[in-house]
Amino acid sequence: MTEPRRPGRIQGEWIWKNSLLNHPDSFLLMRKEFVCNLVELETNLWISANCAYQLFINGRFVGFGPRAHQNCGTSYIDLHEVTYYLESGINVIAVLVYYNADQGGCNKHTPGLWCQMEAQGKIILCSDSTWAVREGGCFCTPRARISKDQGMSQYFNADDCPLNWTTPVFLPDASWAHPDHTTAVGEFGSR
């Protein structure tokens, strides 16, 4: 079995919103515009979230992923090859992050998102305090637990979801801010 590819050097920060740090069932919309002067032959995005994420680039769904490992204090990192989703000029990465502090207290991780995009060894973007974030009020809480050992029931209000927030044409309003809780990445597993 081969070791998965990691970035040459890990940059960026874990980002989140202070008002949701102690909220055990929360959603955060995150986005970052960036410019690609030339789309390289291979552009990679590494991403991790506690607890889960859905990833979009230029309005297209790229993937979803990990739940931070609960027992050993580490976080999983997903690798997405994203060249296909990029365009020359302005691009946007958008991530919906869900955090759930398990009822039994197993999830000791702080909520957050970390990501880093690079091409040909050059960093294109990473998660930091320049991103735009908005509480996911369209995912209504509090929600009922399905059962003692299962997750929460779903309750989504599409009227409160910002239209086209995953696309470059979207213009954030005053409900968007910068993440006010950032933590250095350091070594994965030290969260």
Short names for language-model regions:
Residues M1-L20, V92-R191:
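An acidic-aromatic loop/edge-strand motif
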Residues N18-L28, P66-S75:
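Extracellular beta-rich ligand/substrate-recognition surface
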Residues P24-C36, S75-V82:
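Short beta-strands within extracellular/lumenal beta-sheet-rich domains
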Residues F27, L38, W46-S48, G73-S75, ...:
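Short solvent-exposed loop/turn micro-motifs enriched in small/polar/acidic residues
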Residues N37, L41-F56, I93-V95, W165, ...:
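Aromatic-lined ligand-binding clefts that engage carbohydrates, nucleic acids, or primary amines
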Residues Q54-T110:
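Beta-strand-rich ligand-recognition modules
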